[in-house]
Structure formats: structure tokens, C-alpha cells
């Protein structure tokens, strides 16, 4: 018995040493894990601080102007680095996804947000290399039918947030919350850049002469235009035309007073607006609402708040605080403007025919209300702008966002949509009711 105990004792001692060593290694592993968590936390705090510093650096030159209006919680949003985070999200969007992950990843996203992949072109999600390609997917031919008779058609898939007549220069964001038309479209005096864009006419209308395009769509042009330079040449007056061109903003200011003088407008015309919200699961490209000529674009650098219906009901001045691009021109009934608005994680707004436009770029923001402006007058010596046919693709977002339409139309124009209605590209937005006399 004594011998047995003597044999066991060393074994127990060895076990104790191994147990002690195991505890030491365990404590070491816990220490390493804690260190990793600590470094990760420090890194995240550092990244957040860097993002905040970037946004603060960009906003250095912003002066007091249009302010956030809403509960105190929304003022907290102004301190968040939404522009930088959206820029980082754009980088993530372009990371190539491994082939084996695409079906489950895009399938899960489609299920959560209700994407209709049967109408996508291509409908095989394995062909989308990254999130950006998936978000900006095209539709199969014939997936959207463009109404040939409506004066204005729906420019994007989404939900109607609001619509109506612009009165007193104010648009209604939601009931009880309005924002200024002048602030939405900009003041000519606040332009930071003017330059002429020589953009060739669209490839899909080479068989239609520019004069015919103008006549068919009721767009006025002068005899001097018709006898002027051939398309493709740069007229000597383009520079002056770019600098001295009739200020389209004056059309909106006059419109608010029912005193229309621009583009042959009549005093019986009114100014209307419509706001379409694109959810994350919607088709992300937007199209021309009518046959019109785009004369200029104004790029407003700004915030990137969410533009969801929840935010629209609570945050005043939402669409004039956010980054946006205002395309402005004329159509059959007068003034026309299409304004794609950026949002959180949707800093990138692409305009198909304007490759020089870059949104949500790093750099200091100018004073509130200022914008970069480019004119398209040298695109056509006849039309003095870039022609678009109804249904033409205009551009895209990289995630859900909002499109605002501001347009002139006769007083007997009536909307064919309802607030909160789900709509698709090409459906009629409204009609002009035939006069009874």
C-alpha cells in the first residue's frame, strides 16, 4: 500500500504541474483576446474620429443658412460623419464578392427588401460581381411600358411621397412641413462654377433632325438658330450664351406669382411638383419624364441624411439639406426640372450623359446653398441643350433615394397618382384635362 501511494504521488505532482501550465496558457489566451478587443475598439474609435474629422473638415466653410428642423434627436444627426461613411460604403460596394457567396447574399437581400429578380437583366445574380452592380441592375426589354400619351410619366420605381401645386414658392414635404423652391433649385448668384459642356446628341435620335425634335415637342427656337452652325461645331457665341443665358430660376420665381413669361409660357399655367421615394429594393435607375431639353445642371454638395418616409415626416428641409443634382430645362408646356437627391449610403448620383459630374467627393463644402453649375448649350446649336425622349435613362443611384420633379403645366393639369402609392417607370403621372369650351 505504501509503495502504491509512493507511485501515485509523482503522477499527481506531474498532473498538478500540467494543470498549472494549462491555467497559465488559458490566462495568456484571455489576455491576448482582451488585447485584440482593446485594439479593435481603439481602431474603431480612431476610424470614427477620422470620419468625424473628415466631415468637419469638409463643412468648415459652410455658413449659417438652411438649418435642420425637427426634434432634438435629429440635431444629433448633424454631428455624425454621414458623408464619409457613405463614401466608405461606396468603396465596400465595389469589392468583388466570391462567386459562391453571390446567390445566398443577393438572395437574402432580395428577400428582405422585396427585389423582383425575374425582371432584372441579367436575372442570374452570379453575374453581378459586387453590390454596386447589383444595386444598379438593368431591366429586361419591355419590363416597363412608357405611356405615349401622358404629358408627364413616372421617372422612377418607388412610392409617391407627395405631389401638388407650388404656392408661394413653397413645396410641401409632408403635411405641415414645407421647404423653399428657391433653396431647392438654387440662386444664380450662388453658382461657384460655370462651364460649357459639349455633349453630342443622343445616339438613339440621329434620324430626327433637331428642328423636328423641337417642333414635335413644342420647344421654341429662333430663325437664327436654324441658320446657325451645324451640329458638332462650337458656335462663337456659346461662351456668352452660357454666361448670359436666361436664368431658369427666374421662371420658378415668376411661376410662384402666376406671371409666366419664359419659353412662351401662359399666365394660366401653374407650377407643380412630385416626390418619388426609391426604397433599397426598388429598381435604382431613373428615366426622363417627358420629351424635353436639359439646358443646365446644378450640383449641390450637402448632407446625406436618410430620405425614408419616416425621416421625411420628421426632418424639415430634408431635400434641400441633402446633396442633390438639379437638371433644368424646358419642354412642351414650359419649365421642367428633375432633381435626384442623395441619401445615407447613396452619395453617388450618376447622370448618364454627364461624365464630369462627381458627387460626394472629399473636399470642403461651400456655404449652404452654393452649387457647381454646368450648361449644355453647346450640345446643340439648335436646341441649346441636351435632348431627352420620355423613358430615356437619365442616371442612377447606388441605393434607394428620392427623385423630385418640378414642372410647369396648364392650370387644368391633374395628377393621376395618390400619396403613398407604389409606382413604376412609365406610368402616367398626370394629364391635362380637355377644356369644356
From Swiss-Prot:
PTM section of the record: Is synthesized initially as an inactive proenzyme. Formation of the active enzyme involves a self-maturation process in which the active site pyruvoyl group is generated from an internal serine residue via an autocatalytic post-translational modification. Two non-identical subunits are generated from the proenzyme in this reaction, and the pyruvate is formed at the N-terminus of the alpha chain, which is derived from the carboxyl end of the proenzyme.
Keywords noted in UniProt: Decarboxylase, Lipid biosynthesis, Lipid metabolism, Lyase, Membrane, Mitochondrion, Mitochondrion inner membrane, Phospholipid biosynthesis, Phospholipid metabolism, Pyruvate, Transit peptide, Transmembrane, Transmembrane helix, Zymogen
InterPro entries: PS_Dcarbxylase (IPR003817), PSD-B (IPR033177), PSD_type1_euk (IPR033661)
Topological domain spans for side Mitochondrial matrix: 19-38
Active site: 157, 287, 401
The enzyme's E.C. designation: 4.1.1.65
Record protein name field: Phosphatidylserine decarboxylase proenzyme 1, mitochondrial
Lineage, opening ranks: Eukaryota, Fungi, Dikarya, Ascomycota, Taphrinomycotina
Gene that specifies this protein: psd1
Amino acid at each position: 500500500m505504501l509503495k502504491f501511494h509512493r507511485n501515485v504521488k509523482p503522477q499527481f505532482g506531474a498532473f498538478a504541474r500540467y494543470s498549472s501550465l494549462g491555467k497559465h496558457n488559458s490566462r495568456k489566451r484571455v489576455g491576448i483576446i482582451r488585447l485584440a478587443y482593446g485594439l479593435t475598439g481603439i481602431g474603431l474609435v480612431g476610424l470614427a474620429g477620422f470620419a468625424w474629422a473628415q466631415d468637419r473638415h469638409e463643412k468648415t466653410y459652410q455658413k449659417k443658412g438652411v438649418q435642420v428642423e425637427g426634434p432634438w434627436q435629429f440635431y444629433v444627426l448633424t454631428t455624425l460623419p454621414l458623408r464619409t461613411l457613405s463614401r466608405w460604403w461606396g468603396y465596400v460596394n465595389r469589392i468583388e464578392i466570391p462567386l459562391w457567396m453571390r446567390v445566398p447574399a443577393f438572395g437574402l437581400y432580395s428577400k428582405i427588401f422585396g427585389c423582383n429578380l425575374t425582371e432584372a437583366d441579367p436575372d442570374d445574380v452570379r453575374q453581378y460581381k459586387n453590390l454596386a452592380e447589383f444595386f444598379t441592375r438593368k431591366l429586361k426589354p419591355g419590363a416597363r411600358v412608357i405611356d405615349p400619351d401622358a404629358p408627364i410619366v413616372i421617372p422612377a420605381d418607388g412610392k409617391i411621397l407627395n405631389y401638388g401645386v407650388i404656392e408661394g414658392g413653397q413645396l410641401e414635404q409632408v403635411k405641415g412641413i414645407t421647404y423653399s423652391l428657391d433653396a431647392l433649385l438654387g440662386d444664380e448668384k450662388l453658382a461657384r462654377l460655370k462651364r460649357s459642356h459639349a455633349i453630342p446628341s443622343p445616339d438613339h435620335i440621329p434620324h430626327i433632325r433637331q428642328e423636328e425634335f423641337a417642333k414635335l415637342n413644342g420647344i421654341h427656337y429662333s430663325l437664327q438658330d436654324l441658320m446657325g452652325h451645324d451640329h458638332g461645331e462650337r458656335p462663337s457665341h456659346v461662351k456668352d450664351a452660357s454666361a448670359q443665358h436666361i436664368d431658369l430660376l427666374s421662371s420658378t420665381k415668376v411661376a410662384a406669382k402666376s406671371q409666366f413669361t419664359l419659353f412662351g409660357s401662359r399666365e394660366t399655367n401653374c407650377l407643380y411638383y412630385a416626390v418619388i421615394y426609391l426604397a433599397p429594393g426598388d429598381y435604382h435607375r431613373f428615366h426622363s419624364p417627358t420629351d424635353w431639353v436639359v439646358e443646365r445642371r446644378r450640383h449641390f454638395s450637402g448632407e446625406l441624411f436618410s430620405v425614408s418616409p419616416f425621416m421625411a415626416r420628421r426632418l424639415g428641409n430634408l431635400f434641400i439639406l441633402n446633396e442633390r443634382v438639379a437638371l433644368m430645362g424646358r419642354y412642351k408646356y414650359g419649365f421642367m426640372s428633375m432633381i435626384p437627391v442623395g441619401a445615407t449610403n447613396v452619395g453617388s448620383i450618376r447622370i448618364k450623359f454627364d461624365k464630369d459630374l462627381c458627387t460626394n467627393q472629399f473636399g470642403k463644402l461651400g456655404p449652404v446653398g452654393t452649387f457647381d453649375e454646368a450648361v449644355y448649350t453647346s450640345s446643340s446649336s439648335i436646341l441649346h441643350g441636351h435632348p431627352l425622349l420620355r423613358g430615356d435613362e437619365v442616371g442612377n443611384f447606388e441605393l434607394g433615394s428620392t427623385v423630385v420633379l418640378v414642372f410647369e403645366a396648364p392650370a387644368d393639369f391633374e395628377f393621376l397618382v395618390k400619396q403613398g402609392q407604389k409606382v413604376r417607370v412609365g406610368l402616367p403621372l398626370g394629364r391635362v384635362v380637355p377644356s369644356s369650351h
